[in-house]
Amino acid sequence: MKRCLLLLLLLFCRVAPAQVDPAPAEQFVRQYAGHYRVSPELVAALIDVESRWNPRALSSKGAMGLMQLMPATARRFGAFNPFDVEQNIAAGTRYVTALMWEFHGDLRLVAAAYYAGDHGIARELLNYHNPDVVAYVLAVRRQFMIRKYGPMRSQRRFTP
């Protein structure tokens, strides 16, 4: 009986999500957002949605770290260890900056491209019909509005 309880406890500890304190990473968000002149609220909103501030997050598709960078994107923007908080935020913020330039500051397209890949969104522009992409854009927008204006402002209706 003790052995069974111990196994259940160990299994629960492995499955239960870890509580992550975002405070240490938020300083890097402010630092790199300021350096690359991109909204720190946007970067933080992407992290909220992508990993919920878990620096060890690993997706089923292989995206890694706080900003869920794919290996090629991480290398392209200078994160050689995507699980390193500072490298991940620096590279992710550089990527967001590149997307801001590519999509002329349109936050909907930036969020869609961050989720679905910049090449697919560049071809279709606002004609993204994938419900997962639309849901992602809305989730990022909601977190952005909460961070920028507080929870009440985020309740306004938004069309992607």
Predicted regions and their residues:
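N-terminal signal peptide c-region/cleavage motif recognized by signal peptidases
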Residues: 13-15
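Sec-dependent signal peptide recognition
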Residues: 2-8
